[in-house]
Structures are given as C-alpha cells and as structure tokens.
Amino acid sequence: MGIALCKPERDAAAKNRQIETQIRIENQANKRKIKMLLLGISDSGKSTIVKQMRVNYCNGFNETEVVNAIFLIRNNIIDAFKHISLLILDSHIIKSDTEKVLLKLFAFESQKIEMMQEVDELRLINSIRVLECISVFFEHYSYHPMIPDNIHYFFPHLERIAISEYMPTVEDLIHMRQTTLGVHEISFDYQTQTIRLIDVGGQKTERRKWIHFFEGVTAVMFVCSLSSFNQATEQEPNNAFAWETSLNKVQNKILVRSTGKAKQRPGMVNRLDESVDLFTSIRENNFLKSSNFMLFLNKIDLLGKKLETIQFVNHFPAYEQWITNDNSVQSVAEFIESMFREGLDADQKIYAHLTQATITTNIEYTFGLCCDVIFNKNIETLSLE
C-alpha cells in the first residue's frame, strides 16, 4: 500500500512540475533565439543594413520617423554641399563672383543654413544645385573621398526634395545618414528562429561599449566599406580597440600583414586598414571564438565607380604582387577579402559576401545565405549536446 501525500506536499510537487515545465519551454525558446552583432567602423553601411532589416522583416518606419527624416535628409544635403563647396573653392574650377558668395556660405556657414526658416533653406539648396561649377565638379570629381556617398543618390532627386511639400520615400530613408550613438536592437522572426540584431555605434568613442554585448553571440556580421580604400581618418594616440585594456591584447603580427597596408600619411590612418585591424581584433576576442563571422564587403557599387578613375595600387602598393593585379572590381575585392583572412586560425571560418546595402533585395538575399549557415551550425551543435 502506497504512502499518500498530504495536501501541502501535493501542492509543492505540482508547483515543481509546473516550474520544470516552464524551464523546458524557456530553454526551447532560447534555443530558437539567435543573437547577432552588427559591427564595423563608422560609415561602413551598418545602419543602412538595419534599416533594410526593418523594411524586410519588421514594420518599416513609422510616421514620426518619416517626418523627422525630412530635416535629417536636408541636413545630409547641406553637409554634402559644404564639402563640395570647400573643394571647389580650393580648386581650379572656374567660378564667378556670384557663385563664390554662395559657395562660401555653404562652406563656412552651413550650420547657419540648417537653422534658417524652411523657405530660406530651400531657396539656397535650389540655388546651389544649379550652379555651373557644381555640374563641373560632379562631372570630374564626384567620387572624391571627402564627399558623402549618399549625395550621389540625393543630388538627382533635389528637385523633388527641395520643396516644402516634400515627404521622404522608403528609398530616401534607406540612403539617409544618421550617426549611430549608443546601442540599437531590433527583434524579428525569421523562419523558425527569433533574431536579435544588435547595432552599436561605429565611432571610436562608442567601441568601448561593444564588450558588454560579446557574450552569447551566435554570429557577428562585420560590415566593411570597399570604397574606403582611398579615405583616411585622424589617428588617435589612444588604443582604438578600447576593450583590449582588460582582455588579451592582439598580437603585433596582425598589424603587419603580408598583403600590405596602405601608403601612410603622418597622423592619418587609412580607413580600410582601420577596418581590417578592427575586424582582426574582434575575431581574436575570447568571447567570440565560437561565433560565426559574416563579412559584408559593402559598397561594391561605389568601389566600381571609383576604380573607373583611381588606380587601387596607388593606395595599396602590395596589390602589384597580387595574382591578378588589374584594376577590376573582382580582383580588387578579392585582394581586400584576403586582407581580412590574414592570420586566420585553421578552425576559424569567415563567410564573405559582396553587398550593396542600399539595395533591399541584395541584403535580403545575403541575409538569407547567412541565416542558412547559422541555422545549420546550430543544428549541428544541438545534435552534439
């Protein structure tokens, strides 16, 4: 004859079963969650990819975001004309005295323009866009490294944008530049999984925050701008990789690549070199040893445009020794990919993709390829447990 449980014991046993069931449910749910980190230096196209994810898998942009984008897009345009004006004023491009007045206004008082009444701001934008010297600039110097990439999209649309009734399209928001400060996370369902995509600022001052998100990462999506090969940024005396102060420092060998670095300028660092060194530092991080690495070699379209007039070997002399050292997009892209693979451990894999983040279908397709790899690896891992 069995021993009957008293009521308190029956209640406790039932509660334990309930807790165990809940734990099993949560464990199963956690196995379906994929944590992805989106990393890269500033202006690599990270935020554009996040916006594409929102368009493809979330609800896109709300009304408030669309209205706010009006001012951000116009500020993007004013900022672009600021840099263009500075270059024209310092060039041999012919400009009349009247044109010089407008160029100097944009070059040296762009912030004042941004603070003007809308009618005055639009009048100035519409005035500068039709200047003869601006047309000459775009004909000969449109891919100068100081010019923001998105002006190539916005300039042909200025007649539509520079009116008081303007309302941004989804395409406009995709091309809009906005510096990522802090951490932004979106979650969405993809097939049978829940994706947590975490985007952290690419500015050097923001990188110290990255370490807090390295634990439990399934995949790292690292974005590099292929078109940054002829761009430079100021070199800071402090360590660019802030987390290294508390973790194992990156070995010096990664800073001397057999593929070679760019020609150095005093006090400056090539942005492509900066991207490669940052990627290697992340890949060497102990927290991410078991993570999948997806390398987005972005802005393939802009690379092609630049290579029409710029010789890659003039910026990376080691390219002369490359197998196919012509100035083609394919050859240059393969060389750049090899820079990221330098010093790769035998058991580490990098899945590289050529991307154009401003094209929705391109990112949708590439993201699908990445997820196929990640999901298959997850299945392999779970089958071993």
UniProtKB/Swiss-Prot annotation:
Lipid attachment in record (S-palmitoyl cysteine): 6
Region of interest: G3 motif: 195-204
Keywords on record: GTP-binding, Lipoprotein, Magnesium, Metal-binding, Myristate, Nucleotide-binding, Palmitate, Transducer
Domain G-alpha: 32-385
Superkingdom classification of source: Eukaryota
Binding partners and assembly: G proteins are composed of 3 units; alpha, beta and gamma. The alpha chain contains the guanine nucleotide binding site.
Family: Belongs to the G-alpha family.
Function: Guanine nucleotide-binding proteins (G proteins) are involved as modulators or transducers in various transmembrane signaling systems.
Protein name, as recorded: Guanine nucleotide-binding protein alpha-5 subunit
